[in-house]
């Protein structure tokens, strides 16, 4: 197996995921409920068979990760579960408090690095798909170090190049997420679907420097409130789940408040929460807020930011595109799971399933 990455191996969107992984692991939960929450968040436009695979195979993938040595946060001897927007049950597994993406990807990377059957090619940017008669047989890549083109031949090719969110002024994504994977697939003749759906995360820090550091949805899951310029909550009047409504609803509601008061942000208030719990549960976010001169235990200025490409390259439930032997995985794929809007923390579990 040849693994190509256009930068260093850790620089992937999954690495920056804070909240966690959604999967049914508690006896008080059910896959039917996870299925329903996914469909509701997706505005009914999800592919039902694909969602069924996600929610039913997800718990087994989590079990396999744990058996392989992955450590998730525990509470009283059981998996610690968080609550996020659109979920009617606590089912979000997390690791390192608010560093789930980093912990899971670091764990997987260690397995890859130590696997003698996998060769890693860093600083290799894929610039073309090798194909003939609608059948892929590899890729053309540009070696960013030697500044030369290289060919990689393969029986099966998988593109996992993420989304397009870095083309927006405010984004939670790394700068490499510019849609080059989408362009590659489109130029190769792949079918593209649902590109009208771009998810904006409701709560990214607002600063004058335009840095949009993500404030995990799990912070609202722990009880943080969204308040307007008068210090009043506005989400309870908009949705029954208040601050934990699906992301599209929360992001739209925040934007309307910004227009109403002619402000660039609203406030995420944690004043009423135990500071020690906040620091323990969200150590990385707390540290980042300190760097920016923000007291996380008081209130944080937040505004929506481009976060996730819901649409992408059309695939079946195996990741197969309309071009033989070319597969798409992760955010770049449009398998129908997300519908019009992704349910929080369904992205990492989709990658595992």
Residue locations for each model-derived region?
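Glycine-rich active-site loop/strand segments that organize a redox cofactor
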Residues: 23-54
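An anion/pyrophosphate-binding glycine-rich loop and adjacent beta-alpha core
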Residues: 9, 184, 190-301
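Short hydrophobic core segments
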Residues: 151-162, 185, 231, 326-330
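Glycine-rich FAD pyrophosphate-binding loop
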Residues: 1-21, 27-28
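Short beta-strand to alpha-helix junction loop
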Residues: 46-59, 92-110, 121, 171-179, ...
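Glycine-rich loop(s) and the adjacent beta-strand/alpha-helix scaffold that form part
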Residues: 156-213, 260, 346-353
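Conserved redox-cofactor binding core of oxidoreductases
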Residues: 66-148, 153, 160, 204-207, ...
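A glycine-rich dinucleotide-binding beta-alpha-beta segment and adjacent secondary-structure elements
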Residues: 121-122, 127-136, 141-142, 281-333
């Amino acid at each position: 197996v040849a693994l190509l990455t256009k930068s260093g191996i850790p620089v992937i969107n999954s690495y920056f995921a804070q909240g966690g992984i959604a999967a049914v692991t508690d006896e008080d939960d059910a896959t039917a409920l996870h299925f329903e929450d996914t469909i509701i968040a997706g505005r009914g436009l999800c592919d039902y068979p694909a969602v069924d695979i996600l929610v039913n195979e997800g718990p087994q993938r989590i079990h396999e990760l744990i058996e392989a040595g992955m450590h998730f946060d525990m509470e009283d001897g059981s998996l610690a579960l968080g609550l996020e927007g659109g979920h009617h049950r606590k089912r979000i597994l997390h690791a390192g408090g608010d560093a789930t993406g980093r912990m899971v990807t670091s764990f997987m990377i260690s397995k890859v690095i130590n696997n003698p059957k996998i060769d890693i090619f860093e600083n290799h940017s894929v610039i073309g798909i090798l194909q003939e008669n609608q059948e892929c047989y590899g890729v053309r890549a540009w070696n960013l170090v030697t500044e030369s083109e290289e060919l990689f031949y393969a029986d099966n090719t998988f593109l996992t190049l993420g989304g397009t969110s870095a083309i927006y002024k405010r984004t939670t994504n790394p700068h490499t997420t510019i849609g080059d994977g989408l362009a590659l697939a489109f130029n190769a003749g792949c079918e593209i679907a649902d590109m009208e759906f771009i998810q904006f995360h409701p709560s990214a820090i607002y600063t004058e420097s335009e840095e949009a550091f993500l404030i995990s949805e799990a912070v609202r899951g722990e009880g943080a409130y969204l308040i307007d310029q008068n210090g009043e909550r506005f989400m309870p009047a908009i949705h029954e789940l208040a601050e934990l409504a699906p992301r599209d609803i929360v992001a739209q509601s925040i934007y309307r408040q910004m227009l109403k008061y002619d402000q660039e942000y609203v406030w995420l208030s944690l004043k009423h929460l135990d500071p020690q719990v906040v620091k323990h549960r969200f150590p990385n976010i707390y540290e980042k807020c300190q760097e920016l001169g923000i007291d996380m235990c008081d209130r944080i200025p937040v505004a929506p930011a481009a976060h996730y490409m819901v649409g992408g390259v059309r695939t079946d439930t195996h990741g197969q595109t309309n071009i033989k032997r070319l597969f798409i995985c992760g955010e770049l794929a449009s398998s129908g799971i997300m519908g019009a809007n992704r349910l929080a923390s369904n992205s990492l579990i989709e990658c595992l399933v």
